[in-house]
């Protein structure tokens, strides 16, 4: 398929638009006493917790409470919130500029597994760089708001239904 046949572009946020440095997230977690050994022991709990949090199935306060149980004594929810901010990553302004240019030729959508807090922080970061989501995307689809996550078929079907996009002309 050539780019001439493409009408719609769908982007992920984390690792595509924004850089996420996994090593810095791990380092930040270790600073709270969540060692590699603890992560290994609690991997199922952490995966379940993050799945529920990202998909808006559990309140942030409940997530922070469970995360506190994995940290060393004396850790506060504010400490954990700072670590979670590491997940916001580095947002190169060049990528935002590229999205604006792409919108002149294509419909541009965002589809991302993200929670409300990180999304709001990301929106603030975009604003600091001089952009709004309305300038960057025709529409935004977020897992926590849809209560679905990638790579489930349901999230793609819902996005297709809401936008009327043609999967055959979408990249």
Language-model segments: which ranges?
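Short helix-capping segments at alpha-helix termini
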Residues: 73-75, 130-135, 164
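Short acidic capping loops at alpha-helix termini that bridge into adjacent secondary structure
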Residues: 38, 134-139, 167-170
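Short amphipathic alpha-helical segments and helix-helix/interface helices
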Residues: 26, 96-100, 156
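Glycine-rich phosphate-binding loop signature in dinucleotide/nucleotide-binding domains
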Residues: 2-5, 104-105, 163-167
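N-terminal helical cap/lid subdomain that shapes the substrate entry/recognition surface
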Residues: 4-93, 104, 115-121
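Conserved Lys-Pro-Asp/Glu-containing loop-to-beta segment of HAD-superfamily phosphomonoesterases
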Residues: 8, 149-171
């Amino acid at each position: 398929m050539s780019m001439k046949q493409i009408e719609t572009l769908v982007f992920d946020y984390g690792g595509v638009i924004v850089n996420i440095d996994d090593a810095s997230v791990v380092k930040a977690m270790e600073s709270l006493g969540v060692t590699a050994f603890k992560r290994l022991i609690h991997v199922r709990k952490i995966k379940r917790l993050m799945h529920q949090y990202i998909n808006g199935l559990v309140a942030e306060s409940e997530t922070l409470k469970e995360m506190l149980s994995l940290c060393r004594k004396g850790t506060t929810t504010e400490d954990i919130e700072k670590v979670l901010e590491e997940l916001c990553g580095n947002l190169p302004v060049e990528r935002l500029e590229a999205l604006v240019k792409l919108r002149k030729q294509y419909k541009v959508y965002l589809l991302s597994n993200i929670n409300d807090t990180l999304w709001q922080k990301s929106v603030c970061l975009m604003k600091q760089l001089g952009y709004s989501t309305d300038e960057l995307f025709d529409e935004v689809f977020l897992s926590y708001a849809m209560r679905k996550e990638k790579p489930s078929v349901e999230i793609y079907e819902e996005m297709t239904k809401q936008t009327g996009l043609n999967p055959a002309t979408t990249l």
